[in-house]
Amino acid sequence: MKQKRKTMESINSRLQLVMKSGKYVLGLKETLKVLRQGKAKLIIIANNTPALRKSEIEYYAMLAKTGVHHYSGNNIELGTACGKYFRVCTLAITDPGDSDIIRSMPAEDKGEAK
């Protein structure tokens, strides 16, 4: 449990750095749009995202060879981690800015073949 909390805190701090210095889009429609354009570097999905939406995002991410991270908190916690006062189910990072969030994600979450 302690390890899980520590990794969640490190992801949250990296997310906050992306919000300050990087470029990102929030929401399903915008996420799918940047995935189709091939601009997304990393997708983050909350754990209570509906299964159909989750599989649709994972399918487009696989086609675009983009990493997908399943956030361990729900959409309210993901919104709070992003510094927003609303729920965020999906988030696409197009430019990480000063953050090393893309390099720091474990290999199994990136969806890429080893």
Swiss-Prot record:
Keyword annotations: Ribonucleoprotein, Ribosomal protein
Cell cycle recorded as keyword: no
Entries under PROSITE patterns matching the protein: RIBOSOMAL_L30E_1, RIBOSOMAL_L30E_2
GO cellular component term, pick one: cytosolic large ribosomal subunit
GO MF annotations, alphabetized: RNA binding; structural constituent of ribosome
Domain of life where this protein originates: Eukaryota
InterPro entries registered for this protein in UniProt: Ribosomal_eL30, Ribosomal_eL30-like, Ribosomal_eL30-like_sf, Ribosomal_eL30_CS, Ribosomal_eL8/eL30/eS12/Gad45
HAMAP family, sorted: Ribosomal_eL30
Family the entry assigns: Belongs to the eukaryotic ribosomal protein eL30 family.
Protein name, UniProt field: Large ribosomal subunit protein eL30
